[in-house]
From Swiss-Prot:
Residues 30-49 bind DNA. Gene3D superfamilies: Chorismate lyase-like (3.40.1410.10), Winged helix-like DNA-binding domain superfamily/Winged helix DNA-binding domain (1.10.10.10). The keyword DNA-binding applies. Disruption phenotype: Deletion of the gene improves the growth rate on N-acetylglucosamine. Keywords: DNA-binding, Repressor, Transcription, Transcription regulation. Residues 2-70 form the HTH gntR-type domain. PANTHER family: MANNOSYL-D-GLYCERATE TRANSPORT/METABOLISM SYSTEM REPRESSOR MNGR-RELATED, MANNOSYL-D-GLYCERATE TRANSPORT_METABOLISM SYSTEM REPRESSOR MNGR-RELATED. GO terms for molecular function: DNA binding; DNA-binding transcription factor activity. Binding to DNA is allosterically inhibited by the effector glucosamine-6-phosphate (GlcN6P). N-acetylglucosamine-6-phosphate (GlcNAc6P) and glucose-6-phosphate (Glc6P) have no effect. This is HTH-type transcriptional repressor GamR. InterPro entries: Bact_HTH_transcr_reg (IPR050679), Chorismate_lyase_/UTRA_dom_sf (IPR028978), Tscrpt_reg_HTH_GntR (IPR000524), UTRA (IPR011663), WH-like_DNA-bd_sf (IPR036388), WH_DNA-bd_sf (IPR036390). It comes from Bacillus subtilis (strain 168). Transcriptional repressor of genes involved in glucosamine transport and utilization. Represses the expression of the gamAP operon by binding to the gamA-gamR intergenic region.
Length: 235
């Protein structure tokens, strides 16, 4: 038997999808929903909590509950693509938070197939879609592969920069994705509540000589993202 709060949740989702409630519209109050659906406040509160966790609505203290903007559909590509390409025509940009050279610790050295304490470029960026922070992106690039990286060069495609400045031809990559909850630092940069749902992507990128040229950790807002996969069938 379906829980009553789930029924209310799906009713509200249908109203959002039908256009009755549009992005940034204020929703009725809890008591108004109680009267509308003839249910208890606890039921309505549970439904709204689920809608917030799933990214359909957002609560602003002292103002009320509002419909969130539509989620950005991000394809899981079969080839390596830039952030701008993944945004499929949305206005995208990057802000560099940090670019430093650090000694590789044990875990970074293993991932980049180098010796401990060898120099590594650490690049931290926030990626924006339509002016809204979407990703917190940390890249580790062997210094010997890309010496002299400049901060002003790193606001566009990193792989294009590696190709044009350092003659590095990207060949392939591996990527894993798992759900996480944001901590205080990530939430501050992505403008979410602490403990908000997000996706952690970890990737390794190789050049044509099978050298690792980047290890990346990308944290993507869960309330603003929907991943899609295109599949084919062969009998």
């Amino acid at each position: 038997m379906t829980a009553l709060y789930s029924v209310i949740k799906f009713k509200i989702i249908e109203l959002i999808k039908s256009g009755k409630y549009q992005a940034n519209d204020q929703l009725p109050t809890e008591s108004e929903f109680c009267e509308q659906y003839d249910v208890s406040r606890t039921t309505v509160r549970l439904a709204l909590q689920q809608l917030e966790l799933e990214g359909y609505i957002k609560r602003i203290q002292g103002k009320g509950t509002f419909v969130s903007a539509a989620k950005i559909q991000t394809p899981i590509p079969h080839k390596i693509t830039s952030f701008a390409e993944q945004m499929r025509g949305l206005r995208s940009e990057s802000k560099v938070l940090e670019l430093v050279v650090i000694p590789a610790d044990h875990s970074i050295a293993e991932l980049l197939k180098m010796k401990e304490n060898e120099p590594v470029n650490k690049l931290v960026r926030v990626r924006y879609a339509e002016g809204e922070p979407l990703q917190y992106h940390t890249s580790y690039i062997p210094w010997k592969a890309a010496p002299g990286l400049a901060q002003e060069e790193c606001t566009g495609s990193l792989f294009e920069l590696l190709r044009t400045k350092y003659n590095i031809e990207i060949s392939r990559g591996t990527e894993s994705i798992e759900p996480i909850l944001t901590d205080e630092t990530i939430s501050g940069h992505l403008l979410t509540n602490v403990g908000a749902p997000a996706f952690l992507s970890e990737s390794l990128t190789y050049d044509k000589n099978e050298e690792v040229v980047e290890y990346a950790q990308i944290i993507t807002r869960g309330d603003r993202t929907k991943f899609t996969v295109e599949q084919s069938y062969h009998s």
